[in-house]
Amino acid sequence: MKKHILFLLCLIAVSSTRAQVFADHFADKTLRVDYIFNGNASGQAICLDGLSALPTWAGRKHHLAELPLQGNGQIIMRNAASGKTIYTTSFSSLFQEWLETDEAQNVTKGFENTFLLPYPLQPVEIEITLLDPRRNVRASMKHIVHPNDVLIEQKGNSHITPHKYLLHNDSPEKCINVAILAEGYTLQEMQTFYEDADIACKSIFDHEPFKSMKKRFNVVAVASPSTDSGVSVPRLNEWKHTAFGSHFSTFYSDRYLTTSRVKAIHDALAGIPYEHIIILANTEEYGGGGIYNSYTLTTAHHPMFRPVVVHEFGHSFGGLADEYFYDNDVMTDTYPLDIEPWEQNISTQVDFAAKWKDML
């Protein structure tokens, strides 16, 4: 695991000397693209839900057309005139996990998904693809974005959520930018949130390879307020009004804590430079969740808070898989045994040598 995340860090956080290539194609701001992934186990589709612009770009400015990981889905941005790939990224989604549940056999649902892309200078074609566990295409769509489109909503220029930096090493373009959001904290509880966010930050940087590369990161705590204190626990019939509507019992797994309100997460972050997201839930219940290039969400007041936030960040930041089995995990049987998983910390031994042989 350490070797894999170190590789990702080196790929993302290199010197900005190659950034001039970025300026050939992109402005120093963000194109936020909202999609709805919908369907059921029999068929899936992708719908464009909205476009908006954010005032800064906090992602990578090098290796723009390279994928460090395959993920369960991919986005390719091409220059519309030449067809040249100018940016690509990968991700996983809660929707794809849901497709493995029994419910997906009989019910059609839609899930919000939001992605941050560098803002193009010229018209671009964006292609987004969802893959199944065998790496076959489940759903795909293409659409053209004109950067001067007057209907691209401008966000992040006002009404910015209160925030403060826990770790600020350099400007956003020279660091990996992590935002920690409050979930289930009222306005009166924000001091507690800042203390919890500081614990989360310190817990992550207590571990390698983050510890050695701490100076490559900025971490900001964002005080997104909730009406109610705490988060929803369906098995106890407790339902709260919170900033992001998070709840336990996702897919009927008691400790799986997620939110489907992805657009609300990104709205709360508009105007703050960010790339990776951690959400802290104000609860003593045990649980959490982490989705690659989407978010980490974890309980903040359970005794296992520190190791859990590190574990879940491994999912969302590093694309790592769980290395253990537990009952009612919908992902347990999703890995075909004749295909090597893209996650770097597990193996079916189909291509074991490429991953770990040099470590033995």
Question: Where in the sequence are the language-model features?
Answer:
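Sec-dependent N-terminal signal peptides
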Residues: H4-A13
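Sec/Tat signal peptide C-region and signal peptidase I cleavage site
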Residues: S15-A19
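Beta-strand-enriched, solvent-exposed domains that form extended recognition/catalytic surfaces
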Residues: H25-L151
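Fold-level signature of zinc-dependent metallopeptidase catalytic domains
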Residues: V150-K211, A221-V231, T250
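Short pre-active-site segment immediately N-terminal to the catalytic Zn-binding motif
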Residues: M190-F193, G288-E312
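Active-site-proximal segments of metallohydrolase catalytic domains
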Residues: R216-Y292
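Catalytic Zn2+-binding segment of zinc metalloproteases
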Residues: F313-D329
